[in-house]
């Protein structure tokens, strides 16, 4: 089993700290710079690539980072994660979001259930429901098709699904796969819900309430606001709402919803876009086939993340460079600048993914980190 040690106790980190600094202005200029752009690129899944030519590294730094990864047993720790080890020691839980899109290692069982089978079953249920909505088997009270889907959630129940929807919306329009327009309500300020409700035809809107516990105050407050708006419009809210929650929540078997789809405690909210949290709204918006393709792409990238060769593992390489920038070069922040308008909400999603995960100063209840946590993403 891999062992966990503070970064500053590793011999390879000390060696990394002593490597000569790279001056980007020198290495990025002229023919040498052009060659560097070609050389410092790692293939990703689905035709993408991770280019780190503009990062303050060279071959000597990369060699030191590879040594750090080996001493820190990064690949081994990731392998333990996807094989079902208790990685979330604070809550004594497995970490299983990767199982929502594929299985990298052994079958993982928790609470007497094969978790990959559980997530696949929920995806199949969502696909069946979405298809029935699209073909008119499930309609509003007047027998008319729903034309808009509105997700009600907060934090990871909003940031990831919203970023994914906006990333795919124009592509879907161009490829005739936009089935329903999607909107999102997340702010507990009633102006947020009011603005969305004023922009949609509530008689033809289907609302997705997302709360793992079924008790999230902000989300339930917004649900009450929406229910009141539906009531004022003479509509039965139970015919316009579905829930995404856990099987043990008070929402799971409530008559207030057309259907309930399930997630569990082994998927953190910020990682939940490929679970039912993202699956319901994205399948309704674009169709189950598009969401399935999204999962396939995520699974393909997951496989690269398991590669023990750092130079063939873009996720591990980027993480290591981030450690170097924060703890050796001393950079306090990282700017995320999407040139694509479709990715306009990606920075907010990434902020939660990275900073909520890697910004914690406590390793456990009794152990504080002696090194810097992640940089602030802006």
Residue ranges and their predicted role:
Residues 149-163, 271-276:
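Conserved phosphate/anionic-ligand binding catalytic regions in large, soluble enzymes, centered on
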Residues 229-369, 375:
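Active-site phosphate/pyrophosphate-binding segments
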Residues 119-135, 164-165, 170-203:
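Glycine-rich oxoanion-binding loops at beta->alpha junctions
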Residues 6-141:
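Extended, charge-enriched "interface" segments that sit outside catalytic cores
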Residues 148-150, 206, 335:
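Conserved beta-strand elements of the Class I
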Residues 160, 164, 193, 209-230, ...:
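Extended, hydrophobic alpha-helical segments in both membrane/secreted and soluble proteins
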Residues 159-175, 199-201, 223-231, 255-261:
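A glycine- and small-aliphatic-rich helix-loop capping segment at beta-alpha/alpha-beta transitions
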């Amino acid at each position: 089993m891999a062992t966990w040690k503070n970064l500053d106790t590793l011999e390879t980190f000390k060696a990394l700290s002593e490597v000569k600094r790279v001056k980007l202005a020198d290495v990025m200029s002229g023919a040498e710079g052009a060659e560097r752009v070609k050389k410092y690129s790692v293939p990703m899944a689905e035709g993408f690539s991770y280019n780190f030519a503009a990062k303050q590294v060279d071959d000597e730094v990369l060699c030191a980072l590879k040594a750090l990864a080996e001493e820190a047993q990064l690949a081994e720790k990731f392998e333990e994660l996807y094989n079902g080890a208790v990685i979330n020691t604070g809550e004594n839980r497995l970490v299983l979001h990767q199982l929502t899109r594929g299985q990298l290692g052994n079958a993982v069982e928790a609470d007497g259930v094969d978790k990959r089978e559980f997530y696949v079953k929920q995806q199949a249920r969502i696909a069946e429901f979405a298809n029935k909505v699209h073909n008119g088997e499930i309609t509003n009270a007047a027998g008319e098709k729903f034309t808009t889907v509105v997700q009600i959630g907060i934090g990871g129940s909003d940031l990831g699904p919203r970023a994914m929807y906006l990333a795919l919306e124009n592509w879907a329009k161009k490829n005739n796969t936009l089935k329903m327009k999607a909107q999102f309500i997340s702010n507990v300020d009633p102006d947020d819900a009011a603005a969305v409700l004023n922009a949609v035809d509530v008689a033809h809107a289907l609302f997705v309430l997302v709360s793992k516990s079924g008790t999230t105050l902000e989300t339930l407050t917004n649900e009450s606001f929406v229910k009141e708006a539906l009531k004022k419009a003479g509509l039965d809210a139970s015919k316009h709402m579905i829930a995404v929650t856990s099987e043990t929540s008070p929402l799971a078997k409530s008559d207030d919803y057309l259907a309930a789809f399930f997630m569990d405690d082994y998927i953190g909210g910020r990682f939940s876009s490929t679970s039912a949290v993202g699956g319901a709204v994205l399948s309704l918006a674009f169709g189950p086939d598009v969401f399935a393709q999204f999962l396939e792409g995520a699974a393909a990238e997951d496989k690269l993340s398991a590669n023990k060769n750092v130079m063939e593992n873009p996720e591990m390489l980027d993480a290591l460079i981030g450690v170097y920038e924060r703890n050796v070069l001393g950079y306090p922040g990282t700017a995320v600048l999407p040139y694509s308008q479709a990715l306009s909400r990606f920075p907010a999603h990434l902020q939660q993914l990275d900073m909520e995960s890697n910004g914690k100063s406590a390793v456990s209840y009794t152990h504080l980190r002696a090194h810097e946590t992640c940089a602030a993403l802006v």
